[in-house]
Amino acid sequence: MYYTEEEVLEYVKEEDVKFIRLAYFDLSGKQKNATIMASELPRAFEDGISFDASAIKGFEDPNKSDLFLFPEASTLSVLPWRPSAGKVIRMFCSIRYPDGKPYKKDCRYLLKTAVEKIKNECGLELHFGTEFEFYLFKLDENGLPTKIPFDNATYMDLAPEDKGENIRRNICFTLEQMGITPVASHHEEGPGQNEVDFRYSDALTTADNASTFKWIVRTKAAESGLYADFSPKPIQDKPGSGMHINISSSDDSKNENILAGILSHIEEITYFLNPTENSYNRLGELKAPRYICWGKENRSAILRVPASKGNLRLELRSPDSTCNPYLAFTLLIHAAIDGIKQNLKAPPATNKNLFDAKIAKSSSYKTIPDTLDEAKNCAENSDFIKGILGEL
């Protein structure tokens, strides 16, 4: 539902809202927030709420440390796990300089700019969806997370083997209460590993929902005395956890250009899709692809076109949940723009099983970077990345 500032102010008054959480993100995609009293909301809409940017990772600049948070009324959601008396609401914020100009390191602003660019220059809109995998681990006697899985179930098992069923149920209910539509959930292949999927949307909404989703999962796991682990490879000899990104276009005739554009820039983008050392423990093992190619329904290809009765979609299978979805989507949109403007053509699809080591080694496909250092070096030397993100 879309709210105006006037409607939010009226809602706060009528529903006895006491606290307003102003949410924003650092460059790693970690959600931050400042809480203000309801009486301060008109000022926040009008003048913004200042904060010390020098204390935020990636924002550090003591000479220009004063930035302002401006809540976006359209992103209003109620926190359903807080008391109903004295409600708490949250809004995502745009970050601005004191003169009112957008802050250049605001990752939501970068994504908004990319969305406008592909609309204005290519005449289309991209929709995004995400598929999150995560592990549920037990806590030790001190309340600290262990690497002991909550259960030993496997892919799509039922209770009692699947002990995560009720937690996934609570996650889905909470998603609905916060305006996010869940579509499916199940136990994944690893012990204690789960997946919950929610409906696709425009790029900014999906990035906002992805960040909210991780917060909800961690909160609901903690309420059950568990730890939700989104790391790419928490247990070395077990399946890793990815964040597959699904992309569809408002103009199917551009799908080949979009696919080709993403493949042509995937090496440079990998640093932002897989930004931790642990990310590279997952890639290339147990259904986590690393070969730069595409296939129809082929899960061993880094980019695949799933079977579908509706609009075609692309599924990028290499990303993981440690990425900043705003930066990831921004770069993917720019790669799509490049593919469209240059009229890039996709290489032939592969039907090879690249999870088979012998088949993979005999293929001629390039791979994405093998390590974080390689990925970082590739990004730092990329004119494509510099042209979009500057010196972030």
What is each of the regions a protein language model found here?
Residues 1-392:
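Glycine-rich, acidic/polar active-site loops that bind/position phosphate-bearing ligands
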